[in-house]
A protein has these predicted regions:
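Conserved catalytic core of the tyrosine transesterase superfamily
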Residues: 1-210
């Protein structure tokens, strides 16, 4: 309108278009997650890595939370894990059957460390570091014929896949340990088609009659 002479001023002068945040990691597809985690362990630490990665994806942990997990963090025979997240807030999370199985396999073959309660240990019997696991995952993803994957992508995939199947944003907020729902909304960027599908399948007044 301003360009064509209908207005004597530009109403959008000084307005800057908001930047789109592309800094969030991309979620892997369920097929890519299966491809990544389908590797057959050949060494002791392959078993550890499989348990670690299965736990990340199963429970949506931050890498810092996962490396801090102890045997005493689990309850009900590895069915739930207690973690301490940001702000020193504790939360209890379910552990999936694949993660539970992988953890038990790791415990069966690992060498006992000086601190028997530490779950994920290195070759010196010490707690592993986030940097070490990032490097291990990077190499594993390339070995599996994939683009580089980092631990946070598994957490992001956990949230995205759970939201796509359930649509329960509030529960996912609790599981991720987000203090604000807006953080979870940004974190789990679903497209409009996915949101419409969830709405159609879940809302009482949106369900189609047979």
């Amino acid at each position: 309108m301003f360009k064509n002479g209908f207005l004597s001023f530009n109403p959008f002068e000084g307005v800057v278009a908001p930047k789109i945040n592309d800094s969030l990691p991309k979620a892997l597809s369920p097929e890519d997650v299966n491809k990544l985690l389908s590797f057959e362990p050949k060494t002791i630490f392959d078993f550890r890595d499989k348990a670690f990665l299965e736990l990340l994806y199963s429970s949506g942990l931050r890498v810092s939370e996962a490396i801090s997990v102890n045997l005493s963090s689990f309850e009900s025979d590895f069915t739930f894990v207690r973690v301490v997240g940001k702000g020193n807030k504790e939360r209890m999370l379910p552990v999936g059957k694949y993660a539970k199985y992988a953890i038990q396999k790791w415990l069966d073959i690992r060498e006992v460390s000086a601190d028997k309660d530490v779950l994920f240990t290195n070759k010196f019997g010490k707690r592993i570091t986030a940097r070490a696991m990032q490097e291990r995952l990077y190499k594993l993803s390339l070995r599996q014929g994939m683009s580089p994957v980092n631990p946070h992508m598994l957490r992001h995939s956990f949230a995205t896949h759970l939201l796509e199947s359930s649509g329960d944003l509030r529960s996912i907020q609790e599981m991720l340990g987000h203090s604000s729902l807006s953080t979870t909304q940004i974190y789990t960027k679903l497209n409009f088609q996915q949101l419409a599908k969830i709405y159609d399948n879940s809302h009482p007044h949106a369900k189609k009659e047979n």
